[in-house]
């Protein structure tokens, strides 16, 4: 568990760098709730690096003006076998 949190730090830092240093200077344009950066943080924390990056990439590719997807796009729950 500790190793998982340590490996997430660089990704969380990059997302926060975008959120607090870059995002304030560009107009808000995310089509979804939660925003893409919030989604990325949640996906990484819930699913880990590999699946979290996969889900984040899919989300970013869907976030464009021509998208006909629903407004709410939540991170999928983590399936637990057993």
Swiss-Prot record:
Q: Give the bilayer topology.
A: Peripheral membrane protein
Report the locations given in the UniProt record.
Answer: Cell inner membrane
**Location, primary (coarse class):** membrane
- Spell out the Pfam families in the cross-references: YidD (PF01809)
Signal peptide positions are: none
What keywords would UniProt list here? Cell inner membrane, Cell membrane, Membrane
In terms of NCBIfam families, this protein maps to:
membrane protein insertion efficiency factor YidD
Protein name per Swiss-Prot or TrEMBL: Putative membrane protein insertion efficiency factor
């Amino acid at each position: 568990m500790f190793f998982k949190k340590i490996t997430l730090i660089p990704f969380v830092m990059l997302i926060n760098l975008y959120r607090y240093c870059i995002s304030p200077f560009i107009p808000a344009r995310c089509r979804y709730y939660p925003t893409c950066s919030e989604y990325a943080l949640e996906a990484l924390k819930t699913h880990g690096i590999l699946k979290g990056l996969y889900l984040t990439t899919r989300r970013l590719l869907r976030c464009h003006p021509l998208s006909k997807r629903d407004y709410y796009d939540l991170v999928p729950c983590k399936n637990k076998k057993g």
